[in-house]
Amino acid sequence: MDTTNQSEDIKPCDSDLMESILMFDEPISDILAHNKLWISHARTRSNFFPQEGRHISNQHTEAATSLKMWMLSKNLVVIVKRKDDIFPCKILTRNPENLFVARFLESGKEKHIQVEYSDIIMTRSELEKALPLCQHLIPARNWDDFYIIRDFEKATPYFEQGLSALVKPGQQFELQLEDAPDFYVMATVVKNYRGFLLVEYQNFKRWIHMLSPYCHEIGWGKNEKQEYLKRGPYNRHMNVDLVAGLVKQSTNQKLGAVPEIVFRNNCPVPHRIPEYSACVYLDLDQKRFYFAHKVTTKTCRNNRHFFNISIGKNLVTSKQNNRPYEFHVYHPRILPYSVAKRMEVQIILPPDVKLLPDESNLDGYLRTYCNPCDKHKTSDRVQPSPKIAKKKNGPLLLDDTPDAMFRSRPLLGDNIGAHKEWTNFMNHIPDYKRKDLLKSMDTLKFCEIFRPTPTGALQLTAAEVTGQQECMLRLKVSGEDEPVYIHNADPHLYHLGACLDMELAINFHGEFFDEKPLKKNKNANNGFSSF
């Protein structure tokens, strides 16, 4: 089934505008009663059947986790000391009280046991004494997962606190600008809604999640710049500069900086995406998908961490400064074509692509934009012999030149964008929980989402889940006619009932609901509801 299409309505523009909002809309006087009415409607519509929600809004779940559970993640290798018994182990699962680990034995095997958080060595001095006694037990393949002791020393004072509770109004951190990541500013926290932060720098305000890759500890930018200049452009560091004139001291000097440990994982990772690699792009309104490809522009100083994309001839630009927008490899609105195809969504093709006979839209786009040297191409990475006219279960082989068999097709795989975030999330769930999650995913019927209003504010809005597959949801949003697509880990997506936790009025209308209760999806495949 070919679900792609051509359209002349192409407006490639992106700036994460929803992150640049001054305030929430809260027009309801009795917020609590209004929100309870929404919850009652949703539960009645779902026949009071429990909803599965572990696979969505994982950034908010992570921000609410205690620091000790957040840092001691699955597969992390630590050193444990029980009286005179010192041994290394790998974390399997954890709960608020204790940990279930795999102890490495002299025989090379593993023994599953339970340990307390207090049993783990968390100071450098103790580790230096203990490690020589047991390091020979750690398999070579597990050394990459060995814990970083300096991070645990920094975290010790906050170990029992929730992660989001460490960020308080008045504290400061360094914020890398999303529409110009070559620059960063000193930002002050104004509000904290369970990790979703309103921050200000000089006269500007912006919403951003505390676990965004653009949030960093004080001193990050200076250190990053120094390491970049010392090691050269081909390293993991970035060429960033502080925006002049925007340094503003905190109004509450007692609060100072956000604890450094909060941002330990917040940095865009380097990528190796080849030029002209094709992907699918979800627009800023989150309603339309476009064929797109990776390009490099002169405005992007950090090409190892960020890249630009183009929809045909049109660069995706920032609405705020018309500068080519710079994406990181896990950006939630970039999808592999294979995922979009499985979702069976319409993918818009630029109007200047002229399809050849029996040519798919994907092949037409690749031929037109992704390798100017080729007249024809297919979407296959490894080409069969040019004598073969058609590949089984694949597109036509249109290039009959002798070197066609050696050309690789620039089509991005699953390790990018929203799908990569989904994969990382699923890999950290124990096997027995993962199977249960996949079976029950189709019970998710309602959620809450921040949507921009005509006045330029964010409004927490009611939404009904009309389809889901892998890393994406399709939503029917109150007050909007077209479906909205959103990545499971998008920080604007919340569980049902978040309005009560944050005490924000939710936007919903009675006509949004069909009076009939929802029925269970009979077409669900292993817990996935097809779009």
Swiss-Prot record:
It holds the Pfam family MBT. The keyword Transcription applies. GO terms for cellular component: cytoplasm; nucleus. GO terms for biological process: anterior/posterior pattern specification; axon guidance; negative regulation of DNA-templated transcription; negative regulation of multicellular organism growth; nematode larval development; neuron fate specification; regulation of cell migration. Signal peptide: none annotated. Probably acts synergistically with sop-2 to maintain the transcriptionally repressive state of homeotic genes in order to regulate various neurogenic identities. Specification of some neuronal identities also involves expression of non-Hox genes. Specifies dopaminergic and serotonergic neuronal cell fate, and regulates neurotransmitter choice and axon pathfinding. This is Sop-2-related protein 3. It comes from Caenorhabditis elegans.
